[in-house]
């Protein structure tokens, strides 16, 4: 998946990420760009407009929770399937989330990182993070296979 150099790069960069800001924005953008994903968050209240989604405190809080889990995965890049096994089971067996949504969220996360960090988020770092989000999405989808 990742070389030692790539792991070092993504891990060092992740230390700069403000999980609460980036998580809320990433989940919010997922819900705006891919509105069918909103069906999993009906209890979050008003998701009727982009502004409502992006300013919804429940979206922000859950986005932080998602990125807290992602942060844990960043500490276990060699065992993503093991790290995300319980979440895979939850999302498959109880929540019935389409595993394609994990890929969508990963791609949105990469967009948000690029937006927040600009030139510091180099093409090489983007490529490395694309590998990470793909690995996390595959780990979360593991229970479905």
Swiss-Prot record:
Coiled coil stretches, renumbered: none
Record PTM S-nitrosocysteine, positions in chain: 92
Annotated binding of heme b, by residue: 62, 91
Modified residues (N6-acetyllysine): 58, 81
Annotated Globin domain residues: 1-145
Tissue: Red blood cells.
Top-rank taxon: Eukaryota
Keywords: Acetylation, Heme, Iron, Metal-binding, Oxygen transport, Phosphoprotein, S-nitrosylation, Transport
GO terms assigned for molecular function: haptoglobin binding; heme binding; hemoglobin alpha binding; metal ion binding; organic acid binding; oxygen binding; oxygen carrier activity; peroxidase activity
Signal peptide (residue range): none
GO terms for cellular component: blood microparticle; haptoglobin-hemoglobin complex; hemoglobin complex
Residues with Phosphothreonine modification: 11
GO terms under biological process: hydrogen peroxide catabolic process
Matches recorded under InterPro entries: Globin, Globin-like_sf, Globin/Proto, Hemoglobin_b, Hemoglobin_oxygen_transport
Family from the record: Belongs to the globin family.
Subunit architecture: Heterotetramer of two alpha chains and two beta chains.
The protein's name: Hemoglobin subunit beta
Gene name, Swiss-Prot/TrEMBL: HBB
